[in-house]
Amino acid sequence: MSSVETRNSFNPFRVLFDLGSYGWLHPSRLLLLEIPFVFAIISKVPYTEIDWIAYMEQVNSFLLGERDYKSLVGCTGPLVYPGGHVFLYTLLYYLTDGGTNIVRAQYIFAFVYWITTAIVGYLFKIVRAPFYIYVLLILSKRLHSIFILRLFNDGFNSLFSSLFILSSCKKKWVRASILLSVACSVKMSSLLYVPAYLVLLLQILGPKKTWMHIFVIIIVQILFSIPFLAYFWSYWTQAFDFGRAFDYKWTVNWRFIPRSIFESTSFSTSILFLHVALLVAFTCKHWNKLSRATPFAMVNSMLTLKPLPKLQLATPNFIFTALATSNLIGILCARSLHYQFYAWFAWYSPYLCYQASFPAPIVIGLWMLQEYAWNVFPSTKLSSLIAVCVPLITILKLYTSDYRKP
């Protein structure tokens, strides 16, 4: 066999584990295999009703003229999501015959899942992640369930979040800020990206433009709140309730601690402190590499409008890793996680394990443990311990390692 033939021959190991060596097994082709699989899920696996009816009842009240968030009530209670959620599910209300055509809704969510998976695959290609990372992504049982069998708004939130990350990696900053705010208008979980995003904006664009982007994010939120301005306080306290109590019954991540600790103020204060400490630590060691500025210097730059020094350019790999890490830190320190929240971070966790310089077998093993933990229902002490330990191990390794460079 000639040397040319050897170079051009298909090597499955190289395709799976080499940087950017996707060959003919490109993510777009792999996505085609998802189509019959998704059809099979919809036709063979029973749909599980959790929040869809409540969403439709709340939308129906909105369409009948109710604008007080505390009075937009469904079978599971009052509406607790921002205006973007209302507009989105109003559209779904019309597309699904008032919410009665569940199968049509499932196909819509399947399409959202497919598009989100394609976007993440494109992101992986941009940062030259090995192909096995993408294979792990589409094998996730829980992600398929969240989108296709549960119809949670977390699916649309992850779609807009993925578009936000993609726009950031392409340095389309205005588009990124708008998409981040749109994602937050569906579910405020996307606020977890904000710390790293602001650090990136400040170092890349300077303080004046960073303030401009903050105003863009706020303006988008105000636009979504316009229909509810007559009940201003009701809207903002319901849609962005940071003091919301969580039921120990549904926690995925803290089952291994006693209920008394879970419900205590000291516990919530402790994990909030840990959250802030980790954000500061990553800012000091990793996210500030573009300027080598301290957090105090960054705050001073924002207040005085004096730009930070620019020591190096931001690569897509650096931007992607910083944003995904900021999000994962929030997941680790979350007051409580429910099963649908898996869509907030599962797309990027294998890539972060890879970025933490774990070898492929460890990356795959951590992903398998994570999938196990998030597919145990109800959660157990073991599954919740795993659900906390996997992001903890990933974050600690990310902190102590230098990011891979494609």
From Swiss-Prot:
Q: Does the keyword RNA-binding apply?
A: no
Cell location: Endoplasmic reticulum membrane
Which cellular component terms (GO) are annotated to the entry?
Answer: endoplasmic reticulum; lumenal side of endoplasmic reticulum membrane
This protein's pathway: Protein modification; protein glycosylation
Q: Which keywords appear in this protein's UniProt record, sorted alphabetically? A: Endoplasmic reticulum, Glycosyltransferase, Membrane, Transferase, Transmembrane, Transmembrane helix
Against InterPro entries, the record matches this protein to: Glycosyltransferase_ALG3
- Report how it sits in the membrane: Multi-pass membrane protein
Chief place of localization: endoplasmic reticulum
Stated EC number for the protein is: 2.4.1.258
Catalytic activity, per the record?
an alpha-D-Man-(1->2)-alpha-D-Man-(1->2)-alpha-D-Man-(1->3)-[alpha-D-Man-(1->6)]-beta-D-Man-(1->4)-beta-D-GlcNAc-(1->4)-alpha-D-GlcNAc-diphospho-di-trans,poly-cis-dolichol + a di-trans,poly-cis-dolichyl beta-D-mannosyl phosphate = an alpha-D-Man-(1->2)-alpha-D-Man-(1->2)-alpha-D-Man-(1->3)-[alpha-D-Man-(1->3)-alpha-D-Man-(1->6)]-beta-D-Man-(1->4)-beta-D-GlcNAc-(1->4)-alpha-D-GlcNAc-diphospho-di-trans,poly-cis-dolichol + a di-trans,poly-cis-dolichyl phosphate + H(+)
The GO biological-process annotations, alphabetized, read as: dolichol-linked oligosaccharide biosynthetic process; protein glycosylation; protein N-linked glycosylation via asparagine
Spell out where the chain crosses the membrane: 72-92, 107-127, 129-149, 186-206, 214-234, 261-281, 313-333, 349-369, 376-396
**Pfam families referenced in this protein's UniProt entry, alphabetically:** ALG3
Q: Which GO terms describe its molecular function?
A: dol-P-Man:Man(5)GlcNAc(2)-PP-Dol alpha-1,3-mannosyltransferase activity
Task: Give the protein family.
Answer: Belongs to the glycosyltransferase ALG3 family.
The UniProt function text for this chain reads:
Dol-P-Man:Man(5)GlcNAc(2)-PP-Dol alpha-1,3-mannosyltransferase that operates in the biosynthetic pathway of dolichol-linked oligosaccharides, the glycan precursors employed in protein asparagine (N)-glycosylation. The assembly of dolichol-linked oligosaccharides begins on the cytosolic side of the endoplasmic reticulum membrane and finishes in its lumen. The sequential addition of sugars to dolichol pyrophosphate produces dolichol-linked oligosaccharides containing fourteen sugars, including two GlcNAcs, nine mannoses and three glucoses.
- This chain belongs to the protein called Dol-P-Man:Man(5)GlcNAc(2)-PP-Dol alpha-1,3-mannosyltransferase
What is the organism lineage in this UniProt record? Eukaryota, Fungi, Dikarya, Ascomycota, Taphrinomycotina
